[in-house]
Amino acid sequence: MKAVKTRHVFSNQTPQWVITTVIYMAFFFFFIWYHDVRAKPFTLFTTEKCTAIASAYCLALALALGPLSRFFASFNGLLPYRRTLGLTAAFMTIPHVILVFIYLPLKFPEKYSVDYCMSWFVDHWFTIVMGFLTFVLFMVIVVYSYPSGIRKLGKRKWMILQKLAYLVMIFIVLHLLSMGKIPKNWIAWLETRNHPVPPGSFPTMMGCLLPLVLKVADLIVHGDSLALEPGDEQDSG
């Protein structure tokens, strides 16, 4: 079965940005409510977490649209939202990073050494490295998500860079796993059912894994879409 040719855009209409903003805010406030149900009321702590979770879900939607469009042609009309969702996910990692540096010393003061304020970050170096790689790769992709990006790189290299967004999602998964909550908190909840809903890490991880599973299925069924693209010499002339 031949893969559907995808459509890339370098600018979006205002309604697309509005809808994307609504989607992001819907995820954000849903997880604010979700944490409240789990006896974690609205605080700087939940704000930081839900900012990141909403970003991860927007990235998940952006990544899922490509494979879905190759399985179901009805999704082709939604492909322009890959850009708005992806850029929103990337830009909203900025307040997440800022909030991390603000709230961590307040939330976990016992984890910080009086003599060395970066002790928590050293102790959790892998978590920090995965977060750092996520942020840096996100920003690189953002820089080249404009018309000048494809002119500088050529179509094929540009498409390869855009596909590295899946690597961003893998970094996010590793970032989550390195926090030590998975599967420990899941098992604890299954044993106690002390809250009406599972830990927030459960729906977050499922949301992150879904587009990766879809991409693997897409590669198995349709092959790599890059193989169908002509070389840069033909594209950038």
Task: Give the role of each language-model region.
Residues K2-G237:
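Membrane-embedded alpha-helical bundles that constitute the cytochrome b-like, heme-associated redox core
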